[in-house]
Amino acid sequence: VIHLAGLERKLGLRRSALYDIVNHQATTRLAAGAAQAGIRHFIYASSLSAQNGSAADHALIERDAAAPVDAQGRSKLAAETALRASGVPSTILRLAPVYGPGMAGGLAFLLRAAVSPLPLPVRDFTNRRSYLGIDNFLSALNFVVAMPTASNDVYLIADPGIPPNMADLIRAIRRAEGRRALLLPSQVQYAEWPLRMMRLGDIWDRYCGNLRVDSGKLVAAGWQPLYDTRTGVARLTQNSGAALRRVTPPAA
């Protein structure tokens, strides 16, 4: 069984009960059915939010204690716990934010800003954030499916290499379109503190905080990711640039 369905984090969604129903309870029922049917390997696509919030001061690894900070993350962690309790052999993949054709949400909106013709005041943003290209996710999934037995383990999954900062992403995308970066200097602190004062720090963390993921555990097991994030977003821009321009902003 490969369980990919779930309700991802949305800025405008505050109903914790809905996250619990879709992510936790549905997974619990599916795991119970899989155990009853004698399934030998249940692969669960969980989320990095089951382990951490939108920012971290160190590179995340599997040994870090799980400390979700919102309803979506808590529901994912509860689903993981229920899966283990079911007794079905399993592998849990905690995914960094995924990008690819048809993507939505905050990362899509950021990429939309990158493909716009406007100069962007992000030259001095030095935060580094890990992402996961859809092809790298599928590569990791195929690797786990081919394992001779279920690992009964958890793996963090992200693109390889040093994660890009916001300026890196803009440069990579605009270079893929044959354009200059057009990055303007900025006073980062003057952008951050008003959001903190308005208790909107999570929005800042989600776009501008550090969130580095170490996927070395699965790489050590033999997984070979296909490309880094700079290459991935450049390919996405070349193939789906027009679609990115139509992305709607995330809910506030």
Predicted regions and their residues:
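NAD(P)H-binding glycine-rich loop region in Rossmannoid oxidoreductase-like domains
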Residues: V1-Q25, R29, G33, A50-Q51
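Glycine-rich NAD(P)-binding loop of the Rossmann-fold in SDR/ketoreductase-type enzymes
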Residues: L18-R29, A66, D70, R74-S75, ...
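Glycine-rich Rossmann NAD(P)(H)-binding loop
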Residues: G100, V122-N127, Y155-P163, A172-G178, ...
